[in-house]
Amino acid sequence: MKLFPRSILIILVLSFALNLGLVTKTHAKDTLDSIVDILSGLTCETQGVGDLLRTEFSHTCIVAPFFTFAVMNLVSPVLYMNTFLKLKINDSDLFNDSNFGNFPGGQCTRENRIDPKNPELRFALCNNAKLIVSRAKSVAESALAIAKAVLTGGDPWDDIKKAWENKKKEYHIPYSGKPGDDGFAFDAGFPVIYWKIIQDKDRICVSTKGFTGDVPVGCKYMKEPFPKSMYNSFMDVADKDFIQDPKETPTDPLALVSCSAAGGGCYQKAYNASKTAVVMTSPLIECMRQMIARLLISKDVCSFDNVEQVVNLASRQDSALFQFQVGMYKIVTAFLTLYVMFFGFKLLLAGEIPPKSEYINFILKMIFVTYFSIGINITPGNGSPYDRLDGMIQWAFPFLLDGINGLASWVMNAAPSGLCKFNNLSYDGTVSYIALWDALDCRVAHYLGLDILSTLLVENAYRSHDFLNFDFFSFSAPPYIYLLIPAIISGNMMLVSLALSYPLLVISVAAFMVNATIMCMISIVILGILAPLFVPMFLFTYTRNYFDSWVKLMISFLLQPMVVVTFMITMFSVYDYGFYGKCQYKSKLIHNSIENLAQSGGTSSRDVLIFYINNDWDDISQYPDKDAVESCQNSLGYMLNNPITTAFNFAKDSVSEIVDSKPGDTPTDKFLAKFQFLSGVVLGPGMFFMSPKVLFEKIKNILLALVTACFTLYLMYNFSSQLAEFAADMTEGVALNNVAIKPQAIFKAGMAALAAAGAATKGVDQIASRGGVGDLKAGQGGGVSDNIAKSGGGGPNDNIAASGGTSAPTVTTPTASSSVATSSPKTVSSEARSDVVTPPPAPSEAVSPPPASIRTSISTPAPQSNIETESVGKIIRDNNQESKKEIDNTPPPQEKVDNAAPQEKVDSTSKGTGVIDYSFNLKEHENPAGVKQIRENAEIRDKRAEVEKAWNELVASGGGRIRDQQGEETSERRTNAEKKWNELVDSGVVTEIRERDNSVTNKFDKLADELNKSEKAKVEENKNIENDRKENNTTTSPQEKVDSTSRGSGVIDYSFNLKEHENPTGVKQIRENAEIRDKRVKVETAWNELVASGGGRVREQEGGEVSERRANAVKTWDELVKSGVVTEKKDNSSNENS
């Protein structure tokens, strides 16, 4: 019996051996081949290798080159290979039932791609434990088949082949999942396998962990519109912001748009994501970020979060960085080659083995330079520039650009009062940076009062349902508004400037922050594009400084916005404490119903976070003690923003204190003395007047708060001027002053505008207070026209001598050629004095010159002088009044005489006559209030031109008072000229002034007719001395300035003493006028000396003997001509008129 089992086994083996020879060779061979094939997959790993070598890829539906597996094994060692060999997706034997999934024809056919409506991926993982059980079962079934064949004498091979059929479903475990699902698979050998379902554009993949994150192992395509289609350049399936119904994602291609204008664009994306009531800066930053992403990555993406979509696609060729990288391939390769060569020479020449650290440093430098300059090729043997891991767009740019907002947001959210504190966790991940700019917009809107309406509604609606403290007037009106309203009503520009100084500074610093951030982002982009040029310089010691400077600038532009934000938070915090004390803010997230009304009832999904002062004084989390409550209630901001609540709380507390107290046996006066309120309601000395003590305390608190705020404003204003340099010094970078708006730019512009408005208002008030231009009369009647005889009207120095243009003729000795000139609207009194010519004596019957010789100064022969010397002072004072009127709004004349300026007016008739033209170019004054004055001056100049024309015609026709005395025959031309002149005299446009006593002048006139040429100079000098004595006996006004050389010649000098203009901008003009007058005096003195000595161009033509005095005078005059103070005009063609 003991030998029975052994005997049975021997019999079975012998029977199997005998029957084996009866089977056909072909049948046995096929069966054995099947068994060998199956036994080659004794484990899941060996089976995976076999499938990889003999069949198509079973682990994925998307074929990839073998080199990809090698790279992925480096990124995810062990894990990737283990998952790769066990994963099954493309296997029709598995996925043909309800358990694994029924996919006729296999999972990878186009018809069986993943439905985007239900993006579920089915896959299976091989399990070694179940595989061992399956193989043991096959061995047992084979043994039974052999025993059966021995006993029955049949063929066992069919049963054996059936026993060894590859029953994959027995040792594969089915899985399914959607993007984001993950799990673990437990097995023998390598016990745990981690898997996760991820979506990569139009593919859903099974991934495992690696050094760089989730590494895809096997993938399957989704249905249309995927894969690559006409919409792929602007589609992003992962973006659900613009999809109303996520279940209907693939049905409408335009619903997938996230970067195009069809989705609202960058502005709409930022606006919808913002949570502040007044959106100002976040759309600007979002549009800048999208522009940078398109510039650096591809035009098909609008965020660095989508960089993986185009890493291996040809759409990257539109990137500026990519194009520069392609151009730098050979140069970077040359740098790396030189580095390898130098390192090899170093090893050969060192004579000893270098430490291992140098080898490690060598390898790390090579990897670093390649990764950040041109990218590492992830497909060995593939020369495509698209299959590269680029460190700049995958790591550097996202870190730097997100870091700018990240660092600044840390500081911005550190507000002690809780005002405008936005948590970036409440935003979508792609727009979390908007929390920083929402905080900035919120603060600017709060300090400028732009959120008054929204805060009013929300605060009253959510006031802890305490309607006893309901205050309809409670809103966040900034304190400056309470100064601005009375300032505008009163018209006090100083008060307006004080009220607007803080909001202007807030706007200016906020604008600088936005501008500085954008400039830092642009600078980082520029430096990043140049990375292929600067990063290879890291290899060599000689060029290392260039790389260090490049990195230092990158870090500086990263940190500078944080410094600016720190300054802003400090400024805002001090301001909050100065105006609001220890008040704390609460926030409420509401739906923007106001926005819906503005959009005509449209729906809006944007929620707004509103901040208002917490008036729940029992909230110990924000008001831990009574001092904090009193600090808030007594603050200026709270009292101004909550006037009714403040009064109500004050009255309630006072009355409650009295009611709750029991007098007992205390006398009434002592009982009432216990209450501070009652003891304070007595009149007491205030700061400026008698007032109740309680009211005085409130006024004192308000004034102290204002002083604190002004002092804070002063400190912040001065510090802000150096903010850009301070930020640059802290970060050792470049200051942004030259490329960004300065922190005080808007503040100074606003203050300048207020100053200009104040000056304009002041100028209008002055004109109105004078009663208009018509009131500026000399007291003789006739309005403005009465003043023409006394003053010019074209500018501060457009004063015409009595002998010229609009005044009566003057008398000099008989001359051969009388110099009569027309007046220019832009000439001055010194011109009249300088144009005096004393020609040699001539017969009394000399005729008057032709009209071509007319100039401002009139020199005509006359036996009598028609100037009334007693009225000189009155004439000068009248002209002073008119000149002051014109000076207010007229710019200073140019110092250069007779230059070639376009406005210069040159009288060609004066050439060759020895008359010097001193016409100065006057420009329009910048004060707009002078427009009316300038228009009236133009009317005066028109009247003057009319007077000059009439007088010139009168003189040219042989008329005038001098000719009347000579008894000449009156021609028709002379008659008409006299008629026209008399009409002007009768209408009051011009006034003739005559001198009473002419005996001295007549005496010298007769002597001058009898003297010869050699004695005339001496006689003229004596005549001037006599006239000096006569003029000294006449009382003149303090402003009168008389030229001694012109006395007796009929020329009156109208020089005026200019007073300080009320407009401070006119001080410079007055100073320049004074310098011009000094130059004129110098010119007049030299010219008068030249004429008195017998010199001048007219005398030179006579060939007289040159005296020492004349030589000195000529020398002085020539020096003035050479220095450009005066320009002498000559015309040789008119010498015959001299």
From Swiss-Prot:
Q: Give the Pro residues compositional bias ranges.
A: 838-852
Task: Output the Gene Ontology cellular-component terms.
Answer: plasma membrane
Q: Where is the composition biased (Gly residues)?
A: 775-784
Q: Where in the cell is it found?
A: Cell membrane
- The signal peptide annotation in the UniProt record is 1-28
Q: Which keywords label this protein?
A: Cell membrane, Membrane, Signal, Transmembrane, Transmembrane helix
Residue spans with biased composition (Low complexity)? 801-830
From the record, give the transmembrane residue ranges.
331-351, 359-379, 392-412, 494-514, 520-540, 554-574, 699-719
Q: Does the keyword Amino-acid biosynthesis apply?
A: no
The UniProt entry lists membrane topology as: Multi-pass membrane protein
> Polar residues: which segments have biased composition?
854-869
Superkingdom, according to UniProt?
Bacteria
Which Pfam families does this entry report, sorted A to Z?
Answer: TrbL
Keyword Cell membrane present in the record's keywords: the answer is yes
InterPro entries reported in the protein's UniProt record = Conjugal_tfr_TrbL/VirB6 (IPR007688)
- Which GO terms fall under biological process for this protein? protein secretion by the type IV secretion system
Q: Basic and acidic residues bias: where?
A: 875-888, 961-977, 995-1032, 1058-1071
Q: Where is this region: Disordered?
A: 775-914, 958-977, 995-1071
Give the similarity note: Belongs to the TrbL/VirB6 family.
Full protein name: Uncharacterized protein RF_0089
